[in-house]
Regions:
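Thiol-based oxidoreductase modules, predominantly thioredoxin-like and allied folds used
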Residues: 5-6, 25-39, 49
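Residues that form or immediately flank small-molecule/cofactor binding pockets and catalytic motifs
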Residues: 9, 34, 74
Length: 84
């Protein structure tokens, strides 16, 4: 499952969401509109300078982990590689 940390007026954020829908992959949209301080915190945590910040969640019976995919371009490349 992908997590899309995005802002509602960000074209690349909306394109990432649309790409997940078109590709029929599970995703969750995390709206980052409301707190500029939290947006900056998330960018710092993931060491990514722009939105969207896209991660992939991995689940096991007892744990979960979240790995950075990148932005829209990186998501697009990853989904294209899954199609092959």
């Amino acid at each position: 499952m992908y997590m899309i940390y995005g802002v509602s007026d960000c074209p690349h954020c909306l394109r990432a969401q649309a790409l997940c829908m078109e590709s029929d992959v599970d995703y969750a949209w995390v709206m980052m509109d409301w707190s500029k301080q939290y947006r900056e915190h998330i960018k710092s945590d993931w060491k990514w300078k722009t939105y969207p910040i896209i991660t992939k969640m991995y689940f096991t019976e007892r744990t979960s982990s979240e790995v950075l995919v990148g932005g829209f371009d990186e998501l697009q490349l990853e989904l294209l590689s899954l199609d092959q």
